[in-house]
Curated annotation (Swiss-Prot), chain B:
Belongs to the DltC family. GO terms for cellular component: cytoplasm. Its main location: cytoplasm. It comes from Latilactobacillus sakei subsp. sakei (strain 23K). GO terms for biological process: cell wall organization; lipoteichoic acid biosynthetic process. Pathway: Cell wall biogenesis; lipoteichoic acid biosynthesis. This is D-alanyl carrier protein. It comes from the Bacteria.
Amino acid sequence: MPNLQPYANPNYFIILGIALVPLIIGFLNGKRWHIYETLVSLLFLVLIFDGDKINQGLALIGYVIFEGALIWGYTVYRQKRNNTALFDLAVVLAIMPLVIVKFVPFLNPGRNSIIGFLGISYLTFKAVGMIMETRDGSIKKFEPWLFLQFMLFFPTISSGPIDRYRRFKKDYLKVPERDHYIDMLGKAMHNFMLGFVYKFILGYAFGTLLLPRMAHLAMASRGGFLDISWGLVGYMYVYSMYLFFDFAGYSLFAVGTSYVMGIETPINFNKPFSSPNIKEFWNRWHMTLSFWFRDYIYMRLMFFLMKHKITKSKVLIANLGYLTLFLLMGFWHGLTWYYIAYGLFHAIWIILTDVWLRFKKKHKDHIISNRWTNYLAIFATFNTVCLSFLIFSGFLDRLWFH
Amino acid sequence: MDVENTVVEILADLTGNDDIKDDMDMDLFETGTLDSMATVQLLLELQGQLDIDVPVSEFDRNEWATPNKIIAKAKELQ
């Protein structure tokens, strides 16, 4: 069997198209065949993880068994008791494989952990989400078949969007109304076409054609203050465009495929560069990641701090929440100085944005606010976001230290 | 306890806006009236004043988006 990486070449799409036809016919006739859906998923999981990726495939199997056993155990326990230390332990165990995978290349540069596999970062969110919902009493039973379907849902396995168990289960168990499914098919078609333009035309143009030239130019123009040059500025914008079109393109494919399969996976991008400030930006960029951190980290931490009256200052609580959220997000990307700097950058930026928003609210009557100030805000936000992406790209590491 | 009045009072307090009762179908999140911090405060107030326990994972923004929806949810969970 050949190895095909998700959405990477025409063969993947051809096989996908052929495999999905019976599903589409079924749905249009009001029928849902879970067995067939599962066979298609298995086919694609094999295609993604065979050949030279077989070790990853084995790691994936081991990981799913481990997380399944953990979640099952915790779910059973939680129906009788609710000890906090045990909940904390369950979460720590759930993230252990990912932590190991992130630490190995940090301790041993150049080496990758044998337990790693494509998508482990994203599957871990799904697993931890399930544990937290079980803790909260929202999930009361472990359902192995649904768990496997949720975790191994192949359209989103490599890089999300990150779905949530109960939302997925609801979609999975129902047969969409014919009219609704036709609507979903329409959206899927639109997603595939837009995804194609984003990933294979724009993302390709920016990432494969322009970016290396900018990199070359920036590296050759070192010597100024902080090695800044027009080449570096060019790199910043080109990289930002590449990042958006490549990732948004992938997300469109993932969501489109999900829709054809009757699962309304949440979207990841919603005109992010039209955001007037960084708070709005995180409602529009990599949305499923942002909302996961918001709901499972930020809100829980704030709830804890406020309930236990750790401090009276709401501002301090919010700021601690932001720092925790964005630093964790930085670490999640990897144990490099630039990922952590990226997290810190966004933490500080959002804290300062809150300062500004509070000031604006207080002096509402003395601050100009019109169409032009809004454009200015969008422009400023866009540029600052691009600067944060330059940090995120790791290029500064190349520029300054190599 | 009058759920409707309590919720309106809590919201007015949180947002610093007494006119909240004039538009009970306003989307509080889209308009930026409520953010995550205010949401947590809302849940804590509901717990304290109406004895309603809402775990954070139960909170779905779609179901709690407007004052009317919040009142409906509060009544349901009482």
